[in-house]
Amino acid sequence: MRERITFIQKQGDSIEPTTLKIKGGVLNGPEIQAAREDRLTIAIDELPKDLQALLGTAHELHIRYVSSQPYEAITPLLARLPPGFHLFYTPAGQADATSPALCLALNQIFGNVQCENPEKSFTTLPRDRFSHSAAYQFYQPSVDLSPFIALVKEKLCSSSKDQSCAARADRLANASSLDISYDAISHAVKLTATWPYQKQEVHATSRPQTRTEVGVLNSDRPGHLEPHELGISGLLTVLGQDKKPSATMFAFASRHRDAESSFSAEFLEPTGLHPTLKLRLESSKPPIEDAYCSPHAYFTLPKTIFADRHQLSDDLFLASKNLTGLRYISQPVDLEAPEYVEKRWGSSLLLELSPPEHEESKSWTVQVPLHLRYLSPAEGGYTDIQVPYPAVFWACAAEEGTKFPNNPFEKANLGYDGLFGPRTVFWHVEPRPTIGSRLSNMIKVPVLDTNKAEWVSGGTGLAVLLGFAWIMWKLFGVLSKSGYQNQPSQAAEVVKAKKNQ
């Protein structure tokens, strides 16, 4: 088992090495302004037998939880996803795709995860484009981390002598993101949690049979840095091995960068059953000038709302909304089915945006047409649904021959990264809430009022009965006047005339 705790400051921040005290496998330091990332790497044979059996059904499994609270991301922790619970999965065999084992385990670990099995509830990803895409995708707008935190306390903290283990597990409730990744090649599970840029107390404790590495780092820009690289400098120490921190400086290629811009999202009023989501971007200026760049928005829409790919195929319509084109949408998307009969989680789509020309420093807007599904009846006649913010980024092509090997902070299997080539660099635009403090928008959807459902069903039945009675009365009136077959049909008259000739 290996543990890595990293405090990351902005460029220009610094900490005096003498303020870090190491004693008996414990590191203490001052309170600093920094982001924090904790990563725990566990070999599969160190896990409980039931989890080993579950992971044996997966070739790869990536769970990504993103908080709906806005947070400031700093270099190199820049990769973003829409807020919510994301899962990317490749089964070990075809039979595992139809097994309910994964969904049952997700419900035990995270509570109410609405899935039956991957084949029914997940959507498929286009693996024919780039090899690093998983086979299936699942998404849910919200999930409760309390069951997972309780599981961590039970499995990791119950046998640990570290008094801070339970407290660290409780801090997961305030994490900006939580990632759990497994692949059959490494035979290891990586749990990674990040907290946003804020005041953090520098403190770390080593655990028995665990190699604990602690870093206090900040972004740096040495003169030899390549355009596609990020520089990092700071202090590193291995608890229980080093007596004092060691200075370090290194650089690595990264596909995720900061566009140093922001956007917001809100629905135009009135929303109706065909709401339009308006994105307002702070700047239309590309993040770099010496490469081809295009802005994109990646959506994960729950099954209560969807986009119509036919509508998004009209070039003139797209141009009127400042959209260039629909680059991807998951399939199938039933345009008529109500929400309560849909088995799949929803749909994901990638839209290329069309920034205005010759206005590089001004804000601009994009309109995305969406459609609501019919929802289940509810008391009061309305149901509130949450629509998460998309992930907005500029996709820029790196120079020919540029390679992006794995780096210590890299994130892959994000859903949209598999839709681009391996030399694409993502310059992320920071989301900012328009109203409130959540990166989602609420829509009040009209539904059948359960308090009036009896009147509606009774009235419908009465209307059908009256309509049937009226039709029968009219038929009876016609028959009573003319009788049945009293008048010969036109065909019979023709036959009779021919016989008489």
Curated annotation (Swiss-Prot):
Protein origin, superkingdom: Eukaryota
Residues with glycosylation annotation: 174, 322
Entry keywords, A to Z: Endoplasmic reticulum, Glycoprotein, GPI-anchor biosynthesis, Membrane, Transmembrane, Transmembrane helix
Keyword Iron-sulfur: no
Pathway terms, separated by semicolons: Glycolipid biosynthesis; glycosylphosphatidylinositol-anchor biosynthesis
Residues on Lumenal side: 1-458
Membrane topology (Cytoplasmic): 480-501
Name the record gives this protein: Protein pbn1
Organism: Neurospora crassa (strain ATCC 24698 / 74-OR23-1A / CBS 708.71 / DSM 1257 / FGSC 987)
